Amino acid sequence: MDRVLSRADKERLLELLKLPRQLWGDFGRMQQAYKQQSLLLHPDKGGSHALMQELNSLWGTFKTEVYNLRMNLGGTGFQGSPPRTAERGTEESGHSPLHDDYWSFSYGSKYFTREWNDFFRKWDPSYQSPPKTAESSEQPDLFCYEEPLLSPNPSSPTDTPAHTAGRRRNPCVAEPDDSISPDPPRTPVSRKRPRPAGATGGGGGGVHANGGSVFGHPTGGTSTPAHPPPYHSQGGSESMGGSDSSGFAEGSFRSDPRCESENESYSQSCSQSSFNATPPKKAREDPAPSDFPSSLTGYLSHAIYSNKTFPAFLVYSTKEKCKQLYDTIGKFRPEFKCLVHYEEGGMLFFLTMTKHRVSAVKNYCSKLCSVSFLMCKAVTKPMECYQVVTAAPFQLITENKPGLHQFEFTDEPEEQKAVDWIMVADFALENNLDDPLLIMGYYLDFAKEVPSCIKCSKEETRLQIHWKNHRKHAENADLFLNCKAQKTICQQAADGVLASRRLKLVECTRSQLLKERLQQSLLRLKELGSSDALLYLAGVAWYQCLLEDFPQTLFKMLKLLTENVPKRRNILFRGPVNSGKTGLAAALISLLGGKSLNINCPADKLAFELGVAQDQFVVCFEDVKGQIALNKQLQPGMGVANLDNLRDYLDGSVKVNLEKKHSNKRSQLFPPCVCTMNEYLLPQTVWARFHMVLDFTCKPHLAQSLEKCEFLQRERIIQSGDTLALLLIWNFTSDVFDPDIQGLVKEVRDQFASECSYSLFCDILCNVQEGDDPLKDICEYS
């Protein structure tokens, strides 16, 4: 065992197996330790891949070498290496061999033969050891013949015992001597025949207890020798292999005519009886079909790996098996079943009141069709399938009730009303509602009774979405109230609004978008009452006092934002606190449609903040803070630094990636921006991105006018885009506007002119300049 592995490999293997050195060679314990370590070192169990690979390599080498050692070692030590020469006294005395001749007493070795020859001489002095030859000392014969011998011929008691047809080789051992080339044994034709009572010898592959050869008897015996099996006999006087260390004598087999004739007749009788017992089967003339007829393809389910259940099935097998299945299919409680013949086969069509899997039906039928072919499929169209299988070329044999009818498969149509999703989507699109929760709130409110609705009776301006759509959507809202997919319906409607808005941005020019926004504002102004009209005119008067020549300034700003020329499109509002910057920016966002962004946040959160600008006409960077303030009371911030890092966004020359949460990035031109900030110092790189800069100053009379007229603040007239739209139509002629809305502009101007004359508007303007309530001594607003 010390030669199986090198010393380093042996120590490494024992280390991996976690075994002490004294257990080297204990194959059982080593194998058990290998299994335990394999579970610990396997990569799938959390072990090391390298250690597992090393253990497998060493263990495989160890097993291979041990196997080769067992196969190759005999009386000569390792295969291909001559045994050491011992002293003559030791070799002749029959004592133990040298310490390096492993397994020297193994079966068939020279020491094994010597010991047993000495043993037999003690009991039988007449025993003669077989002669030794040069060939017999090379390799032991380990073949053991286990077939029973043929009965001896009683008429020839003096026949010479037959010997083996040569020495058998161990298939696992490579023979070093090529001169030994025994013929392979022939395969026996006949079955085993019983050994006669007179045969006392037997066995093979070594020395027998009686001292005879493998087919012979003891020398002093009186029994006649047995004939060798026919597949060991060789024709003529062909010389066979000689004796070896196992006790086989050199000789040759000679054929016996009687044995040959007896074996030939015995072989023929066995072959004849075997032929009569199992005659060859004829090939089936009509092979089993591979699928259902093509005329039934459209009515069957062709799913193979499906767990879906069905109430109707069609079984295809032989006629006899289908008849048997027709009688035993009651396990599934069929409501209807019929037996059909088709060519050489049959079909069973049945319907059940409960649904079953196809595999369950097929497994049940396969118990009765172990040999016959069987096919089973579910029927998706029972009535149509029944009409086909009961017509030619099919032949209806029997059925448990007179046919199937169409009325058995159709129920009276039940009128089930569902929520009209399209109607909800149209409602959201008409009112520009992109909030799913707001849409759901409106529709749940529409489920109330229209006659008793308080919101509809008041018809307030801020509730016009409700009282304009309540009666129209009341019936659909009742169905929506009991619907389980309310959130899904509202989310789809909101997505439709966003999709329509994005499509409009792609297809329309910015001038067309501005025209549409102005038209919506004019329509809202047209619906105002007299008191509300004066309130909006007060807001127009307040804005005209905010900046010098404010109508022209507003017109330039709208033109700048609409044309959207790269590097000539951004506007900066800079001034002290409470100077009107945020109010004007909010009104622009309301008029044009946009979002307000906060870029004073850290840079890692800026990406999602900028993503809000998707599909917007304009954005507002509100209250941007810088690092260097002209007013020492201002707090520093990161807004200006972030603006400096957004040059591609501010320029509008290239598309930038905008991303929102739970959605993919979208590449588009960043919209123009209106930036409001206090008195901070801007770097030159940021200053160059603004084409128009408006410096605001604090005007106490404007602040006092707002404080004295709380309705301007409560109704957010200053922050409304409708106020700026009214300012445009109040100060410009209709020719300035698009021809499509010139008629609406003239109509709204005439409406407001009828409510407020020019002299009355001048009084409102004077009140604002004096810091009084704009509507003082003009009207009482409540």
Curated annotation (Swiss-Prot):
Binding site for ATP: G575, P576, V577, N578, S579, G580, K581, T582
Domain J: 12-75
Keyword Lipid biosynthesis: no
Zinc finger (T-ag D1-type) boundaries: 416-510
Organism domain of life: Viruses
Keyword NAD: no
Main subcellular location of this protein, as a coarse class: host cell
Cofactor: Mg(2+)
Motif extent (LXCXE motif): 142-146
Coiled coil: none
Motif Nuclear localization signal boundaries: 279-286
Entry's EC annotation: 5.6.2.4
Domain SF3 helicase, first and last residues per copy: 549-709
InterPro entries reported for this sequence: DnaJ_domain, Helicase_SF3_DNA-vir, J_dom_sf, Lg_T_Ag_Polyomavir_C, P-loop_NTPase, T_Ag_DNA-bd, Znf_lg_T-Ag_D1-typ, Znf_lg_T-Ag_D1_dom_sf
Residues annotated as binding Zn(2+): C453, C456, H466, H470
Compositional bias of kind Gly residues: 199-209
EC supergroup of this enzyme: isomerase
Complex and partners: Forms homohexamers in the presence of ATP. Interacts with host HDAC1. Interacts (via LXCXE domain) with host RB1; the interaction induces the aberrant dissociation of RB1-E2F1 complex thereby disrupting RB1's activity. Interacts (via LXCXE domain) with host pRB-related proteins RBL1 and RBL2. Interacts (via C-terminus) with host TOP1 and POLA1 allowing DNA replication. Interacts with host preinitiation complex components TBP, TFIIA and TFIID to regulate transcription initiation.
Function: Isoform large T antigen is a key early protein essential for both driving viral replication and inducing cellular transformation. Plays a role in viral genome replication by driving entry of quiescent cells into the cell cycle and by autoregulating the synthesis of viral early mRNA. Displays highly oncogenic activities by corrupting the host cellular checkpoint mechanisms that guard cell division and the transcription, replication, and repair of DNA. Participates in the modulation of cellular gene expression preceeding viral DNA replication.
Name of the featured protein: Large T antigen
Organism: Murine polyomavirus (strain A3)
Lineage: Viruses, Monodnaviria, Shotokuvirae, Cossaviricota, Papovaviricetes
